[in-house]
Amino acid sequence: MASSGAKAQWVGPSLGQGPRRRRWAWAEEQDTDGRRDQGWGNSQSLPEAPSPELLEDFRRAQEHLPPLEWDPDMQDSEESSGEETEADDASSPEGSTVPLPWLSRSNQQLDMSEEELDEASGRPEVDLAGESCTELECEDQGDSSPPPPGQGPAKGWVTFIKQGSNYRPSEHLEAQPSVEHSRTKSWSSGTVSLRQPSDSLGSTWEGDTEVPQPSILPKALPQSPCHNFPHPGDRNGGDVAPATPTEFRDSLAAPAQNAECSAGTWGEETTSLPSSRPEDQTWKRTKTSPKPLPSRFTGSVSPLSTRLGAIKKVVPQHKQGATLAGHSSSQAPKYGRGRRLNYPLPDFSKVGPRVRFPKDENYRPPKSRGHNRQQGSTRPLIFKSPAEIVRDVLLSSGEASLAKESSLAHTITRVPQEFQTPEQATELVHQLQEDYHKLLTKYAEAENTIDQLRLGAKVHLYSDPPQPSQSFCSGSMPQGSKVLSFSIPQPRVAEWWPDPAQDPQASEATGWPFPRTDLSPSSSPGVATPGRLPQSQGIATDQPSTGQTQALTSQASRLLAKVQSFEELVLAGHLPPQDQIKSLEQLRAAHMALEAEYLQACREELLDPQLDASQGSPRTLNLCRELEAEIYHLGQRLEELQDHMDQTQRETEPCRPDLQDSTPTMSFLPQSAHLSMPSGPVSLPDGQTYQEPATTTTTSPGSSCTLPINKKLSLSIKTEESPRGLPVPLRDRTLQVEQDFHGLLERYLSVKSLPEALRDEDEDDLEEEEEEQDHQGPLEVDSPATAPGKTEAVRVPPGERPTQAEESHRDATQEDEEQMGPMKSPDFRPSMARDTYTPVLDTAEVAQRGTKAMVSHQSSLTSLEESRPSELLPRKALLRAGGPHTEEPWMVSPETDSGFVGSETSIVSPFTQTPEHRLSHVSTSGPSAQHLTASVPGDRTSHPKARGLMVPRRATETGIPRSRTQQHFSSLSSPGRGAQSCHLEETSVAKIAVPRSEFKRQKQISKQLLPSGRTSPDSAPAPTAASTPHGSAESTANLLLNRTERDQAIKDLQAEVSRLRLQLEDSLHRPHPDGPACVASAFNHSTQTQEKLGSSPSWGPHYGSKSTERLSREPNGVEPAEPMGRRRARSSSVPRDVPRLYLSSESESPAPRLSSEKSRTFEEHPEAAQWGTRPQSSSKRRERVSFRGQYTGQEYHILSPKAILKDSGTPSCPHCHPIRTQDTGSAVSRDTTRGSSAADTLRCALCGEVKSSAEADGSSSGPSEKNTPKKPSTPILKRKNRQTGSPVRMAPGLWYLAAAPPAPAPPALAYISSAPIMPYLPPTVYYAAPAPTSAQTASPQPARGPRRTRHSVQLGLNDLEELQAALREAAQAAENVRSTTRQLSRSLSADLRHARSLRGSCLF
């Protein structure tokens, strides 16, 4: 063979194979043919830069190569075998110089071999062979040495096969067992020597490492030149034996050294099929390892240049050798010892070599490794991804299939031993799952840590350094600062603004005009202003809401500092009154601006989910809460300052002789006026404009004539509001805690004392009603609870009033500060409203006007006193407007509106409908109450003190429980404010301290007012009348009216809803409700009562209390006009005031009012309901069963099923007869006490017959007469006339769909809570029809008390059916009403909740 001139040409990049490692092809110079050296494919293009190492290796191999036996064809192949063999192992056919035909052929061979593998897959050996073959064909095609290009791949292959057939591998096997396999003369180097796939397959070449390395093989070639190249790929099977780099290099070296063989032997060896001869039986297929792991050089494909026919020739030989047992890799599986392929090999000539060139240009194939290692260890352990491993393992049915799968699809990657079985794969999956769970756990822990950090981070708004008491989770603060802003998402920024005082925006935002010098030093520490927020934009961007919150917090802090400094100046008396007023107005304006900004920010947060998300962090929420609390406390302090200034003015004014000449209430008026405005015409809420005409000089806050209470309050303001001894942070917290404590204490006391107070009130109301009946005139009638001094003060002439009233007021204030305020405001307001309405501004008038203003203010404040926040809110509104302070009677200070302790929501909430809240509402319904009081004649004014005290006290008392808690939450926090609104605060305090006396006084006041109120009960409907006294009063009235109208509209709607609810409840609770006429009359009466209530401010206070209701139902059966007024006020303020429909026909409209009041009393105070029934009335209405709704507390009067209509002759319909339910008698006595109510026409709900309650219940009139005799006819006649004169009215508490709307009676101003009116369906008490549902007559049941013999109501079957139908219809209507009511309630609630801005609340 012409091996001469064999030279290795470096296949340069000109091969177009990309940045392959240097590829070299051995080009044999033509020996005899003179053929030029040809690289495979493009050998001519190869640069002739032989690789020294490769050449050396090749020479060595060639030196050891013995001359090969050549067939003629082999000679041809030798001649053409001046082939350039790319010794470099390349993974892609691109890198090989083999022409594309080789690639295609190799591919065909691959395909064929795969098919054959499939055919022979039955045998693991065959499988292995197939796998190896395919691997070799696939992988090793790149590694295979190209056939002699001159001969053409097929020719060289055939010749080589021939040679192999001539060649006797056994000899060589004997000579060198490691070369026995090399029958296939494949380069160990990765140029795959083509050997029969059966051999390569047969010997999976686990001992691939044992296969003689190229260096060894070439040396062994002399012994077995054709067998010297057991290819590592042979292990894998296939004719292509991928060789390790070392093997590759060595194999290359051998041909290089043996140039003679290089052209012939080398080319043929590289292309020779292993054991082309039968002797190759020694080449056994040792299926030692099912895992054919490709050599490191993947894709080295021996040029399958043999024709398919030649391969077929060899097949039988391989089959023969297939029987040989494979030997383990440790035995260095002989190449030729494997079984021969039992199927013809594909035409490898069609398969092009795929050579993968290492990317590393400097790469040198490593020295061949020892082949005595297990192939698993020798072959590179290429791990697949867990997914691949699992997929392969699961898809593979067994090791053979796995090997086949891996050999076919993953020739390069080998599944690790531990992952070759499904169990192992499953275990791996479990392991991975566990790891994943661990990672998830760690992630969750990280999230928790982040959350903890977020929660832990706190922003402290205090300028002082962190105090030990203050749990500064945010860490130590280097210096006092108002704001420490952490960006929780990225807590990298913590900025301090030590001198926010330098930020003009803060002052602008706060509206504080005073220079920074005025601010207390604590305020100077950096309060982050919006302008400064950009400095912490990192935070702001992460949590814009947090940035806003911090900005607002800084503003609030600055404003707080200003307020503190202002407070210090005011308390020190350094500021003149005018400056105080101006500064206070400015502070309020700043506070309002801050509130507005806060509300806007809240709205933006609601609208912006991103902000909301940022706000969602507990830290942000805490910031918001703190900010809200701070704003609230600012409002409180401002109110306290206002109160203090008002107190000072009051002290100054009472000191003025002309003011003293005027009713002492003038001093109180300044208080209320101061509450609204420190100086200038102070428009009290609800037209109770504290007009300070020339005659009425607003006392400078510094005036020394403060009442003792005022002084105490002012002192308490100093002490409580800002305990100077404490650092600012602790001071604020202390104040807040004190406020909360006071508020809770007030609420506790009010709740605790409420039963007794109601009990006393009930008793007092009974007495007072009688007294009122006796003393329906001016307030001369002194309620028993009224202190004689107070009564005297009431009776005191105007001249005396100033002093006596003042003294009595002081006493009362000391006793019940609250009482005096209410007395003045409610009593005087109505009378003063009218009296002071006179244009004359004499001192008396001024005093009256002040009294009226106070009365109106206090009347509204009476409830508002309880909830000072409301008056504060109006004052704020007025201050904002810069005009007289108008307060919505129900409106509470922004704190209350915003949902703070005394928030409107609480006021309005069903819970607030409890007597306390309702009372406060009633009193809150300042306009109506004020107007009512305004309608009260001057006689009341003459006794403003007693009246005012009584009415406001009661109102306050009733309103206090909640308002008071609110107030105390706000005002108690700063008693000074309480002092400022001494009547309010004192009233609430007095209520708390002496609820009974309070209630009694209020009852008395309401009674006293009621007599006057009765005189002008209609005045209540026109709240404007009272609210339009003079100038500022008018403006205040206008402002009030604007807000009041809105509020009243809401209240009217709520009242309607409440009426519907009441009607629904009545219809549900009493299957035999009063006839439509009764209901209508009751409704009319209730509306009238509401009107009366509206006219009677004291009603408002009483309204909240059951005793008031009882008072309204005078024992004589005559409802004092005043109680009616009260009820009116209540209804105006709260649905509770709406009279409950009385199930008893007996309950005429007044009775419904009274009973509703009583029921309210029961509602408000179940206890009161129990004892609320007057002993007198108990005997009066025992046939009637009174029960209170579980949720609404509405009192229902139903004839007990036992109760039989007194008039046996009356129709069987029990409703035709007043229902003398065997009540405790209290309700009955109450209704009976009204007497007239019994006399009022009642329409039987069943029969529809309209009878006067007296007619319906002759006997009831008896008991009622007991009480009625006092005023049997007048109120009764009035009520009857009203009922008869006006269309039948439904109980004001409900909308009666069937009945016509109440007559022109002014809409009840019952202020229904924003919360759904009927959160719970009132427990429906279904009484069986008084008469048996069956035709049988119910056996008469004796009345509890001595009653006329009752005749069982007998109803015919038809009547029963009609009754049933009527009841069903009523029930259906009730359900409809209920659903409608719920919808209305929800709608109103939603509107109210979303209309917080309309409520002027700065806090939600």
Swiss-Prot record:
Tissue expression from the record: Expressed in neural stem cells isolated at the peak of subventricular zone (SVZ): localizes at the subdistal appendages of the mother centriole in specific subtypes of neural stem cells and in almost all basal progenitors.
Q: What happens when the gene is disrupted?
A: Neonatal lethality: mice fail to thrive and most of them die by postnatal day 10. Mice display systemic inflammation, predominantly in the lungs, accompanied by enhanced leukocyte infiltration and alveolar destruction.
Annotated spans, PEST:
754-787, 885-906
**Positions of region (Disordered):** 1-304, 317-382, 494-549, 645-708, 755-1038, 1085-1185, 1208-1235, 1253-1286
- Give the compositionally biased regions (Low complexity): 1015-1029
- Annotated localization: Cytoplasm, Cytoskeleton, Microtubule organizing center, Centrosome, Centriole; Nucleus
Function field: Centrosomal protein that plays a key role in cell delamination by regulating microtubule organization. Required for the delamination and retention of neural stem cells from the subventricular zone during neurogenesis. Also regulates the epithelial-to-mesenchymal transition in other epithelial cells. Acts by increasing centrosomal microtubule nucleation and recruiting nucleation factors and minus-end stabilizers, thereby destabilizing microtubules at the adherens junctions and mediating constriction of the apical endfoot.
Q: This chain belongs to which protein, by name?
A: Microtubule organization protein AKNA
Organism of provenance? Mus musculus (Mouse)
Q: Which gene encodes it?
A: Akna
